[in-house]
Amino acid sequence: MSRLLQTPFLPSVSLPTKTRSSVTGFRVKPRIIPIQAKIREIFMPALSSTMTEGKIVSWVKSEGDKLNKGESVVVVESDKADMDVETFYDGYLAAIMVEEGGVAPVGSAIALLAETEDEIADAKAKASGGGGGGDSKAPPASPPTAAVEAPVSVEKKVAAAPVSIKAVAASAVHPASEGGKRIVASPYAKKLAKELKVELAGLVGSGPMGRIVAKDVEAVAAGGGVQAAVAVKEVVAAPGVELGSVVPFTTMQGAVSRNMVESLGVPTFRVGYTISTDALDALYKKIKSKGVTMTALLAKATALALAKHPVVNSSCRDGNSFVYNSSINVAVAVAIDGGLITPVLQNADKVDIYSLSRKWKELVDKARAKQLQPQEYNTGTFTLSNLGMFGVDRFDAILPPGTGAIMAVGASQPSVVATKDGRIGMKNQMQVNVTADHRVIYGADLAQFLQTLASIIEDPKDLTF
């Protein structure tokens, strides 16, 4: 869901100016300039509770463009997803202060919105008056808690805080529609394509993961756009890593890093279990044609086991108490370009396996297009991490902050086992290892949970209700 930039009226606010940084990645110097006129600042929005800074993926509008209330202005990359940001007011995009690829703290100004066309020149002059027209522009310090546009009034001077300017790393460009999948495009790009009668299918987008943005549509409409897109693809198709180079974290990698460091403060322990999967494999083969996925089956089995052992679905946040979560929301780790995200299957114990599978496919598509909404990735109460598709037979997973347990699932492999009558037989078995918060969950709790999980997987009749 696109976010609206709200605008409280303030007596005066600060405005940073463009600054020049000759070396990518260095902090730019703050400058002080006064602003006079009815001009609003467009701030970097907070797209999630954990977001501290955002990266400009693309500007949907250009300087001087007319903006209507509710219209997409910019695509922002948060710590987990890309989102279209809309304006809450009519006006003109007077000046862009953070270019595409630039990073700005939450609450800092990224552009100016002029109420009338007559104020555009004044806004541009004020924005560029303190320095040359460099490639990057610095937002101000002390970001507020919410994303807003504020009116700029007379005669208040405030220094703008520095911001790190990161180079836009070239990444592989993918067609926005492959093999009948849905077209991944910004809302404004879709609207523009309809107006300009541009066919989006097969178009190579310049956004993340091939996402089509407005400039791609405009390029095609102007002629030669398809050839230009193909040329870009040829340039970036050959992967290459510059050995010895220092690469700054992406926004998502930074968020993962902070979460992993935070998890070090939680006392954890691990319990492993071997589960036979012959019956589950047979069920999967039987209902796979109906769109059921193995991930959905594992999530469903896990949710049913959690319903019988609510302490394993609990969480401790303050170190003094814990919560028996009212919903069983199974988060599943998914590797995406440039990071890791955990889409959440909410109320997995109550949703039928067919609906759960459809929901999972939808979440994966949105995750890979970086279009997940916060409630679709930050509401998990228990996490699954599955590396079985890579042939990994056993591994440990790190506990995500704010949850009680995470289960690492290995590959199902044929194993030689002793049968009940003393003979030698073959069974498909998988290894699971659960990492848990020992402040809340104890060894016996996990052992009982894993026994229940094994019984459900080895006799999966309850998974298809």
From Swiss-Prot:
Q: Which residues form the Peripheral subunit-binding (PSBD) domain?
A: 184-221
Keyword field: Acyltransferase, Chloroplast, Lipoyl, Plastid, Transferase, Transit peptide
Q: Where is the transit peptide?
A: 1-31
Q: What is this protein called?
A: Dihydrolipoyllysine-residue acetyltransferase component 5 of pyruvate dehydrogenase complex, chloroplastic
What range(s) does the Lipoyl-binding domain occupy?
A: 39-114
E.C. no: 2.3.1.12
GO MF annotations in UniProt: dihydrolipoyllysine-residue acetyltransferase activity; protein domain specific binding
Cofactor: how bound: Binds 1 lipoyl cofactor covalently.
The entry's family comment says: Belongs to the 2-oxoacid dehydrogenase family.
Annotated source species: Arabidopsis thaliana (Mouse-ear cress)
Gene encoding the protein: EMB3003
